[in-house]
Amino acid sequence: SIYLGYRQLNRINDIGQSFFISESQFDSWINRWKEINGFEKMLPFPREESTASLISTEITAYSFDRVVVCDNAAIAQMLIANNFHFENSCAVLSITGYPESIFTTVLEMLRRNPDLKVYALHDASPSGVALVYNLRNSPDWFFNTNAVIYDLGLLPRQILSSQGVFVINSAESSQQAQQLPEEVRRDLTSEELKWLDMGNFVELESFSPQRIIRVANQGIAKIQAPDSSDSLILIDSGADSVYVVESFG
């Protein structure tokens, strides 16, 4: 992942920042890189595949114990390209339906597991902080199941307590924040709500793949022994089990 216009800031991250370079300049660098290195080590944009892949019935008869669900296809694609799913014996999907060719089949396999653990990996954005809520309450995902959901994503409070994070601001994000379900908003502090309502957000893609993978690995490892880690927080102890792992910061 190439981090555009990154700059270190020694102040609270409540003001949106601008890129130092133009899109055309960035494209020229990428084209030059391709001329020298080829396409081998660059991930293309996640593409939509209208045709589902055929999976052996011997495989579909089984299920996964764990799944990482990302709030965008690019992060899911990066994890898969780096064999994260093999190393952690888990499925990797995006809330947007990536990878399309096997998405429906894998989701059906997951729903058959009564002991499924779900790890949500997301941006510090309105759609990101709503990811766990959507996974829990959408009939397209894990509504009315026993799946336990863990939040491994970026949270606004982690951004507010950090320095040198690239904060983006948009009117659209502000509008989305103010339209978040009440159940999502009440799990956020007043400072977090103010930050989101101002239109601020931080993308996971602004961090290196190495760091994202490390955080996800560490989060999953901590969850294996939650009693030994004070960074694992139960935020809703009703019929739904949702945990937050304080990983970024």
Segments the model singles out, each with a brief description of its role:
Residues S127-L131:
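Extracytoplasmic/secreted cell-surface and envelope-processing proteins
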